[in-house]
Amino acid sequence: MAISMASPLSSWPWAFLGSYKYLLYGPVVGKVVQEWREQGRLPLGTSWCLHLILLLALRSLTMLFFTRRRRVVDDGVDFRQIDTEWDWDNMVIMQTLIAAVLVTSRVFPATSDLSAWDLRGWAIAVVLHVAVSEPAFYWAHRALHLGPLFSRYHSLHHSFQATQALTAGFVTPLESLILTLVAWAPLAGAFMAGHGSVSLVYGHILLFDYLRSMGYSNVEVISHKTFQDFPFLRYLIYTPSYLSLHHREKDSNFCLFMPLFDALGGTLNPKSWQLQKEVDLGKNHRVPDFVFLVHVVDVVSSMHVPFAFRACSSLPFATHLVLLPLWPIAFGFMLLQWFCSKTFTVSFYKLRGFLHQTWSVPRYGFQYFIPSAKKGINEMIELAILRADKMGVKVLSLAALNKNEALNGGGTLFVRKHPDLRVRVVHGNTLTAAVILNEIPGDVAEVFLTGATSKLGRAIALYLCRKKIRVLMLTLSTERFMNIQREAPAEFQQYLVQVTKYQAAQNCKTWIVGKWLSPREQRWAPAGTHFHQFVVPPIIGFRRDCTYGKLAAMRLPEDVEGLGTCEYTMGRGVVHACHAGGVVHFLEGWDHHEVGAIDVDRIDAVWNAALRHGLTPA
């Protein structure tokens, strides 16, 4: 029986290690620690291994920002692609290990013997890049597109039509070796000529990585006017649209960075410059049909976005240790956004041919509780609504604190101020209430409700009393309780009961939490209690003899496309119920605004519509 063998250098030897592959950096880090101890200070001027670690950190952060416009391929990067390209940094690991062996050998000069800058070394590197690296990569790349080499090696790199910056590193060991030789040839020549420098090492490697990432970013960053004014530049630098044609058609545009070699080799795609111009002018720009308007929660979660850490944002938010050293940088961005910023696009996906986007107001959770910031936040939300209206967006759904009752009356402020809005503004809380209510077992006769006089609490109480379920409403305000009770039909008002202490619920096993509970307050719940909740942030589960529900959420339909970002702490494909409520509002084509108080009579209608469109409870 014949045994199929994998092609040489087609898989990574440390693949079985999983995340433990980063232990391979151990000897390099150990060398730096040893030199640090010997010298009594950070060996910045004497340790190549330290420079390798610094380069590793800088290379791993090479990334480009998404923009609303200028996307080359309209498709999004979904979870399947992210998982497939998860180990994009294998090439960086390999290059770091090879470099560590070279720099610790006697052949390589010590950093103390090198100048910080040598212009002649830079000139040599440029000449060697054009004369050696570019043609070598071009012909190697063309060879990789031949039958057996393509199927055994290069086809993996072409797995997806929509590329991202990290796709640049998603290669086999053979391709990685080719790229390493191509990238390092100019450095080797400059050092052999005696004109190497520290700046050349940093500058060349980071510029090489940046240009590779730029090409794969799928975002056009060079103006077509640059090529119109200086036509010769078309042959000296490629563009993301240029590379996208290669990934799409696979028979042209093979160059590394310089289209000149495609022109000389007869493989330059004639559509390259026209496509670049169209993308730059925004001709392929598409107006979103639905927008979910969020805000930043806190400094750490601000890094949970695809244009900062694609891998982290593809998983439910958690405080990863790798994010903590970057906290000062994220804090700096928060300060910058406080003074000069505007609403920006976070992510997008497609559902049944319609484009859905998530926009973010550049404000953090704590800022919503600063009285002096209220006016500015409302102005930002208002500008986002007006921009969406001008663009032709059909529905805009407000998330979390953007629809805070004290801030803007759940969106009522904007609808009243702009009565002619074409975009429908919704808070999505009708579906949020429906999700919570449908979690409650049918045999429950009594519930305990905190946050009872809030917008959601009111709707939940009025709905349950109509089902003849006794609702213990925790509130100190008799006036607010009476106002809600009077809204209920006379025959059901008896089922709404005001309580002022948690002790009143010590025999009730169904708690609906709309206000944060401390461990002491949770103690009053009897054993076996289930905590349903609509409080943000979710309560911490201190009781081991009780169960805790998650925030109201729904799973998007299975035919969603291009979804590659988790919504805060939600799982993959799961969104907050208010987000789902906006989606349902759009899919149904409802023409009313959903702002202010929740219409209890519409809860069942919205729930049934959500199920009809393929959304399911998460």
UniProtKB/Swiss-Prot annotation:
Expressed in germinating seeds and stamens. Its EC number is 4.1.99.5. GO terms for biological process: lipid biosynthetic process; response to abscisic acid; response to salt stress. One of its GO terms (cellular component) is endoplasmic reticulum membrane. Residues 127-267 form the Fatty acid hydroxylase domain. It catalyses: a long-chain fatty aldehyde + 2 NADPH + O2 + H(+) = a long-chain alkane + formate + 2 NADP(+) + H2O. It is found in: Endoplasmic reticulum membrane. The keyword Transmembrane helix applies. The keyword Lyase applies. Keywords: Endoplasmic reticulum, Lyase, Membrane, NADP, Transmembrane, Transmembrane helix. Induction: Induced by salt stress and abscisic acid (ABA). It is an enzyme of class 4 (lyase). The chain crosses the membrane at residues 9-29, 46-66, 91-111, 121-141, 174-194, 289-309, 315-335. GO terms for molecular function: aldehyde oxygenase (deformylating) activity; iron ion binding; oxidoreductase activity. InterPro entries: CER1-like_C (IPR021940), Fatty_acid_hydroxylase (IPR006694), NAD(P)-bd_dom_sf (IPR036291), Sterol_Desaturase_Related (IPR050307). It is a multi-pass membrane protein. Its main location: endoplasmic reticulum. Aldehyde decarbonylase involved in the conversion of aldehydes to alkanes. Core component of a very-long-chain alkane synthesis complex. Homodimer. Belongs to the sterol desaturase family. This is Very-long-chain aldehyde decarbonylase GL1-3. It comes from Oryza sativa subsp. japonica. The lineage of its organism: Eukaryota, Viridiplantae, Streptophyta, Embryophyta, Tracheophyta. The gene is GL1-3.
